[in-house]
């Protein structure tokens, strides 16, 4: 009987991993669905209704991209108030993606004691139009849920502690529909460490199978739900990348433009870190200030708001209707706005908005130069991600499925250029301020 128990536990474990991955993918889809429904009501239905009511009394205000001119200011300031008060009274805020993965890699688990509060904290800034991504808060929630399941399945073997890592990989794979990035990111730069009861007791080959099962389950669930009920978010997909002699001549200038946009991100990150540190423990004041800045940017450049995943698909269809200067300015402003939101209490991720910044920047330069749009987008986005992440291979893995095979070389070269040129010292975060 004992000889049968171990193989049975392994099969049962792999089945649990597949189910866990599927549930993670379904949870990601559901989160995106709720986010889209909430944003649609708050930013389309509601201002449209207000605009129609005030059209006769104040026709000058019943204009603009939201149907009511001061609507972003009202909602973003109200959002800052809600987010700040929620953080102050609950003490719960989503951690950034690096912190989530660091805890999962180091401890093999993630705290799930406030999972419900964390879910709402991850959703609120997105609903109120924050220029942040869903990946950080959502990955933390899924890692916590997987830890909860692993703790309760532990009697079947220590291998069940792998559910947290597998769930994190599954979440990242579904979020970005990037299986290679989802597989590598949570494991990059880590050692096995000392083996013990708390460690994952799986040989390396079997461990890879476990993680791939989780990723397969997550992507399957996410894509199937998207087919059944309508696709929800994910990174944009470009069908073709034309690479001619003219485009190759522009590769370096485009990559440098993306790199400079990445420097803007780092400059804003350091500046708002210092501002946050100077303001001290005032979560409400910080969040309201971020709301005011967000509203001002959104009223002038509407695409600077929101995470950017849905907006990227919209921009693909209608970028030619916008002036090149507006698209390029949007890319730079959004890159500065994202760390501003993050450091002033609108917590979330930065990948989705930064990718959108690269897309907007690329389309702007495509209109300006007449070069192939997908090529410009690939070069600008990859260089921007390389400059922000400082890891060109990881940047390329993240964007791998956005572009066809012909664009991979362009992506790699641009990402290397973006990451290779050292970040100016003045833009590098202060260690003490960062910790504070």
Q: What residue spans do the PLM features occupy?
A:
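Alpha-helical transmembrane segments and immediately membrane-proximal extracytoplasmic
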Residues: 1-436
């Amino acid at each position: 009987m004992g000889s049968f128990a171990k193989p049975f536990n392994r099969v049962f474990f792999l089945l649990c991993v597949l189910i866990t991955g599927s549930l993670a993918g379904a949870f990601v889809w559901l989160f995106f669905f709720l986010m889209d429904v909430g944003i649609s009501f708050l930013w389309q239905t509601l201002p449209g209704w207000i605009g129609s009511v005030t059209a006769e009394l104040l026709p000058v205000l019943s204009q603009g991209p939201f149907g009511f001119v001061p609507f972003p200011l009202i909602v973003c300031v109200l959002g800052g108030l809600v987010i700040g008060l929620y953080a102050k009274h609950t003490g719960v805020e989503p951690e950034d993606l690096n912190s989530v993965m660091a805890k999962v890699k180091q401890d093999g688990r993630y705290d799930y004691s406030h999972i419900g509060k964390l879910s709402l904290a991850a959703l609120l800034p997105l609903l109120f139009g924050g220029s942040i991504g869903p990946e950080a808060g959502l990955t933390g929630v899924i890692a916590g849920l997987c830890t909860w399941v692993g703790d309760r399945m532990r009697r079947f073997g220590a291998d069940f502690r792998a559910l947290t890592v597998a769930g994190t990989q599954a979440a990242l794979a579904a979020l970005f529909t990037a299986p290679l990035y989802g597989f590598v990111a949570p494991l990059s730069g880590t050692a096995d460490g000392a083996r013990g009861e708390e460690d994952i007791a799986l040989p390396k080959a079997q461990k890879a199978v476990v993680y791939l099962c989780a990723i397969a389950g997550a992507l399957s669930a996410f894509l199937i739900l998207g087919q059944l009920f309508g696709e929800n978010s994910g990174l944009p997909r470009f069908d073709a990348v034309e690479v001619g002699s003219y485009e190759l001549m522009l590769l370096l200038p485009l990559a440098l433009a993306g790199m400079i946009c990445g420097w803007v991100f780092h400059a804003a990150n350091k500046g708002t870190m210092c501002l946050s540190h100077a303001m001290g423990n005032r979560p409400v004041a910080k969040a309201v200030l971020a709301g005011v800045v967000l509203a001002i940017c959104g009223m002038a450049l509407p695409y600077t708001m929101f995470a950017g995943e849905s907006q990227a698909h919209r921009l693909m269809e209608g970028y030619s209707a916008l002036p090149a200067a507006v698209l390029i300015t949007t890319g730079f402003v959004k890159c500065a706005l994202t760390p501003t939101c993050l450091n002033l209490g609108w917590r979330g991720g930065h990948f989705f908005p930064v990718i959108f910044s690269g897309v907007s920047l690329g389309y702007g330069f495509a209109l300006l130069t007449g070069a192939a749009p997908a090529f410009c987008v690939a070069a600008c986005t990859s260089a921007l991600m390389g400059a922000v992440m400082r890891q060109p291979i990881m940047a390329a893995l993240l964007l791998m499925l956005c572009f066809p095979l012909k664009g991979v070389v362009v992506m790699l070269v641009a990402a290397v250029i973006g990451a290779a040129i050292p970040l100016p010292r003045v833009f590098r975060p202060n260690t003490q301020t960062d910790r504070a």
